[in-house]
């Protein structure tokens, strides 16, 4: 029998034959030529080779020599180095310098701060009382996360809500879109969590899956120097994975009401020690779609819980909910006007068949960092995205009927700047914070003022400038007038030329 045929190429030239590969060790005792030794360099290699050449013949002597060598290494001396261990000291110093000690005096000077944002900001975020984050006596590790996130000082909503939330009082807060509401409740929640107590101590509920992912990411970034475990759970993802995750320590749970309620009713999510419930976009959570789930979820919380409600709009249903579930709430209202000061709003009268041509003109004339284009139906989203791509512009689309994994990927890629334009339904109007978006286009004009307010609030985030353009058909003209009156804002007719200074600074 031909022995060569038993081995695949590169393994051996038959049993016992010589193989030129220096790393090949024959299993046979009949190897004709010993494999060449590896070539080793440096003092360590020479010392190591000499030790083995001078190895004692007695087994117990060899073991004793090995133990001495291990002890010698454990004392921190590198073989071939100086006996005083200077090299190890240098390595230790290098490692220690990369870790910021929160107890050191110069902790703030050693933070890895992002590049300062020098863009113009409006009074929506600059009209503060002059407080600093350090005035609230927060944990040093939390302050480190706040500054490394790029926050310099509290915005007006943060100045109002953080000290009150830290006292344990219920809050009903109303502030404009894009003025820092997320940090206004994340900071006090992270401050109040005991990281040594491995139970769920706070729950943040939001109406959409994308907002849940965004909020959990903000919590993780702010608390990255704390040992707080943040978990996000939403519908459309694996229930089994969520159940397995809840068997691990979780301090802060972020998610949509339906999924959290489902896990709670199964007995997997235990909320008896949860002292804080945050309702972001509370007006949406109190709509007919979510309110039964929210009220059922509250029944699992202890009587002494704290409830924080944040939104830009509060319908009449909020008053009934407030009277039943909130105890002497502290009311914050920073809505002297509904729309953001930095957003300039225009309308253009067009026929339905002219909308694509008008959109193409806007793309060619405007200085767009990123834009969001809103449609009123799922079908129109996909069709419009296809048309924009055919015009030669990069474009993503997202709507509620897409698979959750696909939605997550689109949201993540658009947020990271992989694409300039996003076509979507009202799924994307709530809380989504993408700082690079400076233009919002209502391809289909919304039916009510609340939807319009949340749509245009996707641009001009955190006091920056933005532009909203509305394509108005003959049937939309009454809606345009009514929304102007309800919001107390002015939507001007679009001029032939738009100055970049009003939306690009």
Curated annotation (Swiss-Prot):
Span of the annotated motif Q motif: 131-159
Cellular compartments per GO CC: cytosol; P-body
GO biological process, one term: viral process
Predominant location: cytoplasm
Region (Disordered) residue spans: 1-85
Composition bias type Low complexity, residue spans: 43-71
Modified residues (Phosphothreonine): 237
Biased composition regions of type Polar residues, renumbered to the chain: 20-31
Keyword vocabulary terms for this entry: ATP-binding, Cytoplasm, Helicase, Hydrolase, mRNA processing, mRNA transport, Nucleotide-binding, Phosphoprotein, RNA-binding, Translation regulation, Transport
Catalytic activity: ATP + H2O = ADP + phosphate + H(+)
Location relative to the cell: Cytoplasm, P-body
Domain Helicase C-terminal: 342-502
Sequence motif: DEAD box, positions: 280-283
Catalytic activity, EC: 3.6.4.13
Domain notes: The Q motif is unique to and characteristic of the DEAD box family of RNA helicases and controls ATP binding and hydrolysis.
Purpose: ATP-dependent RNA helicase involved in mRNA turnover, and more specifically in mRNA decapping.
Protein family: Belongs to the DEAD box helicase family. DDX6/DHH1 subfamily.
Name of the protein: DEAD-box ATP-dependent RNA helicase 8
Organism name: Arabidopsis thaliana (Mouse-ear cress)
């Amino acid at each position: 029998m031909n022995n060569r045929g038993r081995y695949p190429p590169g393994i051996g030239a038959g049993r016992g034959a010589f193989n030129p590969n220096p790393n090949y060790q024959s299993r046979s005792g009949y190897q004709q030529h010993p494999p060449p030794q590896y070539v080793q360099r440096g003092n360590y290699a020479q010392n190591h080779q000499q030790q083995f050449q001078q190895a004692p013949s007695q087994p117990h002597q060899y073991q004793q020599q090995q133990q001495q060598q291990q002890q010698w290494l454990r004392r921190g001396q590198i073989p071939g180095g100086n006996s005083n261990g200077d090299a190890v000291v240098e390595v230790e110093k290098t490692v220690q310098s990369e870790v910021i000690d929160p107890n050191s005096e110069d902790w703030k000077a050693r933070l890895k701060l992002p590049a300062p944002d020098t863009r113009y900001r409006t009074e929506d975020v600059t009209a503060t009382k002059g407080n600093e984050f350090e005035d609230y006596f927060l944990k040093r590790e939390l302050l480190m996360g706040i500054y490394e996130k790029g926050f310099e000082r509290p915005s007006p909503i943060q100045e109002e809500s953080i000290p009150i939330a830290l006292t344990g009082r219920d809050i009903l807060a109303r502030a404009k879109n894009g003025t820092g509401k997320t940090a206004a409740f994340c900071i006090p929640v992270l401050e109040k969590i005991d990281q040594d107590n491995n139970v769920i101590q706070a729950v943040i509920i939001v109406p959409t899956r994308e907002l849940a992912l965004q909020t959990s990411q903000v919590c993780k970034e702010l608390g990255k120097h704390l040992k707080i475990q943040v978990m996000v759970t939403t519908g459309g993802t694996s229930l089994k994975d969520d159940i397995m995750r809840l068997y691990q320590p979780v301090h802060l749970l972020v998610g949509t009401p339906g999924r959290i309620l489902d896990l709670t009713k199964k007995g997997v999510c235990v909320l008896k020690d949860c002292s804080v419930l945050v309702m972001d976009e509370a007006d949406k959570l109190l709509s007919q779609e979510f309110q039964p789930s929210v009220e059922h979820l509250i029944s699992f919380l202890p009587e002494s819980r704290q409830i924080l409600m944040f939104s830009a709009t509060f319908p009449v249903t909020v008053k009934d909910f407030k009277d039943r579930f909130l105890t002497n709430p502290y009311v914050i209202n920073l809505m002297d006007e509904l729309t953001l000061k930095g957003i300039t709003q225009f309308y253009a009268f067009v026929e339905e068949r002219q909308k694509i041509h008008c959109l193409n003109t806007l793309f060619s004339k405007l200085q767009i960092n990123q834009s969001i284009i809103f449609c009123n139906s799922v079908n129109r989203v996909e069709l419009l995205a296809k048309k924009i791509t055919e015009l030669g512009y990069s474009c993503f689309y997202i709507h509620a009927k897409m698979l959750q994994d696909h939605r997550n990927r689109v949201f993540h890629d658009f947020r990271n700047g992989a694409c300039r334009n996003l076509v979507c339904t009202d799924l994307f109007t709530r809380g989504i914070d993408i700082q690079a978006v400076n233009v919002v286009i209502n391809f289909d004009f919304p039916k009510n003022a609340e939807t319009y307010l949340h749509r245009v609030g996707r641009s001009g985030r955190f006091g920056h400038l933005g532009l909203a353009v509305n394509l108005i058909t003959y049937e939309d003209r009454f809606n345009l007038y009514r929304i102007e009156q309800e919001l107390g804002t002015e939507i001007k007719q679009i001029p032939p030329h738009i100055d970049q200074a009003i939306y690009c600074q």
